[in-house]
Amino acid sequence: MPLEVDELRKMDLKQLKERLNELEMQLLKLRVESRMGTLKNTASIKNTRKDIARILTVIGEKSKKEAKK
């Protein structure tokens, strides 16, 4: 299930970075499964990459907002 940007914006930076770490580990596992041929849903790699991009976008927004203060 894709992450909602509104939910991500409500999180603080620490939570976002923790979630980012989780997704990066998940992506690594999915890639290994893909190479081994045991991955059934190949779209999950694409969805995980998009979730990572969403989190990085929100982290960038929050960083810019804090820099302006």
Curated annotation (Swiss-Prot):
PROSITE patterns: RIBOSOMAL_L29. GO terms for cellular component: ribonucleoprotein complex; ribosome. SUPFAM superfamilies: Ribosomal protein L29 (L29p) (SSF46561). GO terms for molecular function: structural constituent of ribosome. Coiled coil: none annotated. The keyword Transmembrane does not apply. GO terms for biological process: translation. Keywords: Ribonucleoprotein, Ribosomal protein. Belongs to the universal ribosomal protein uL29 family. NCBIfam families: L29. This is Large ribosomal subunit protein uL29. It comes from Sulfolobus acidocaldarius (strain ATCC 33909 / DSM 639 / JCM 8929 / NBRC 15157 / NCIMB 11770).
